[in-house]
C-alpha cells in the first residue's frame, strides 16, 4: 500500500496513551469557606489534602482551582462564575460549609467532601480518615511496645471517632488496665483543661497517653511529667501534633481519592446531592518516634501486675 510508519507520530501517540498526566481540559473547584482563608492550609494535614488532590487532578486532565467563598464572593455569585467557566466538579475541604449552602442549587455539580460525614448535612461522597480504626490500631501498637495502662485524652465531640476506637480497643482487657478517657470540652480555657488533666492523671495513672489534642505535651510539661521518661505519648495525627510517635493519616491519599471519586461522578454524569450519603475511609499508618520508646517492665512491676 506504500504506507510507512511515522516514528515521531507513533511515539507521540504512545506517549498520549501511557502518560499519567493528561493535557488539562477543564477545571475543578476547591471551595474555601474559612473566615481566615489562609488558615486552612496552615494545617499540615489539610495542606496535604490540597497537594494530593492537585496532583490527582492534573493526572486526570483537570486543574484544581481554589475559590474563597465570603461576603465578597457569596455562593450564589460563585455559582454563576462556575457556570460561565463550565466548572462542574466541586471538592469541599474540611471546615465550615459556605453560607447559603442550604438554598444553593447543587443539581448542576458533582460534589465530594474531604471531611467526616458526621460534620456535614450535605448528602455526598465524603472522604476522610478512618478515625476509629486508627485509634484501635494505635492502642494495639502501644500495648505491643509494653504499655499496659494506655489512656486517651481528646476533645469531646461526637463527630470525632477517635474516642470510639479507643474504647473498643479496651474491650477484653484486664479491668485493671482499662482507663476512663478524658474528654475535654472545646472552647473551655487552657487552665480548665490543665486542671482536668491533672485530676485525671491522679485518678487513672496512665503509663502512656494516646491523644488527638496538640496541647497535651505542653500541659504534661506544666504538670511536671516528662515524656518519655515518665510516660509514653502517641498522636492520632502526627503532622499537626508536636508528638513524634503515632498515626500518619495519609492526607495526600485522602486528597487523591477525593479527586478520584469526583472524576468518577463526572464521568458518570452524576450531578447534585445523593439520595444516600457515602463514606470513604482511608486507613492511617503507624510511625515510630522518640515519644514512645519500647517500654521495659521491671520484674517487680511485672510481678505486681499479675497479683
Residue ranges and their predicted role:
Residues 123-152, 190-198, 249-270:
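Hydrophobic alpha-helical segments within soluble ligand-binding/sensing domains
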Residues 28, 53, 90, 111, ...:
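Hydrophobic structural packing positions in well-ordered secondary structure
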Residues 29-30, 84-94, 149-155, 181-186, ...:
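Periplasmic-binding protein-like
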Residues 93-136, 235-246:
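Flexible loop/hinge segments that line or gate small-molecule binding clefts
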Amino acid at each position: 500500500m506504500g504506507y510507512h510508519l511515522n516514528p515521531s507520530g507513533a511515539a507521540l501517540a504512545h506517549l498520549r496513551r501511557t502518560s499519567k498526566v493528561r493535557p488539562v481540559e477543564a477545571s475543578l473547584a476547591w471551595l474555601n469557606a474559612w473566615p481566615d482563608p489562609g488558615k486552612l492550609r496552615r494545617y499540615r494535614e489539610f495542606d496535604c489534602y490540597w497537594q494530593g488532590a492537585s496532583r490527582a487532578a492534573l493526572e486526570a486532565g483537570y486543574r484544581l482551582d481554589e475559590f474563597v467563598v465570603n461576603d465578597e464572593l457569596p455562593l450564589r455569585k460563585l455559582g454563576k462564575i462556575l457556570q460561565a467557566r463550565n466548572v462542574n466538579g466541586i471538592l469541599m475541604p474540611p471546615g465550615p460549609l459556605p453560607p447559603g449552602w442550604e438554598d444553593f442549587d447543587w443539581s448542576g455539580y458533582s460534589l465530594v467532601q474531604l471531611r467526616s460525614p458526621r460534620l456535614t448535612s450535605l448528602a455526598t461522597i465524603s472522604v476522610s480518615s478512618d478515625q476509629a480504626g486508627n485509634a484501635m490500631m494505635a492502642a494495639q501498637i502501644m500495648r505491643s511496645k509494653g504499655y499496659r495502662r494506655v489512656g486517651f485524652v481528646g476533645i469531646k465531640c461526637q463527630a470525632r471517632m477517635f474516642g470510639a476506637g479507643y474504647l473498643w480497643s479496651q474491650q477484653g482487657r484486664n479491668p485493671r488496665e482499662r482507663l476512663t478517657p478524658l474528654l475535654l470540652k472545646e472552647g473551655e480555657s487552657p487552665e480548665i483543661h490543665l486542671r482536668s488533666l491533672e485530676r485525671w492523671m491522679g485518678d487513672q495513672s496512665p503509663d502512656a497517653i494516646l491523644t488527638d489534642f496538640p496541647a497535651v505535651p505542653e500541659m504534661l510539661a506544666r504538670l511536671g511529667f516528662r515524656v518519655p521518661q515518665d510516660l509514653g505519648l502517641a498522636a492520632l495525627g502526627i503532622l499537626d501534633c508536636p508528638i513524634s510517635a503515632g498515626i500518619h493519616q495519609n492526607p495526600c491519599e485522602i486528597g487523591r481519592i477525593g479527586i478520584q471519586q469526583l472524576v468518577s461522578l463526572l464521568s458518570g454524569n452524576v450531578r447534585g446531592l445523593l439520595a444516600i450519603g457515602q463514606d470513604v475511609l482511608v486507613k492511617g499508618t503507624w510511625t515510630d518516634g522518640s515519644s514512645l520508646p519500647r517500654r521495659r517492665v521491671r520484674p517487680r512491676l511485672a510481678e505486681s501486675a499479675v497479683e
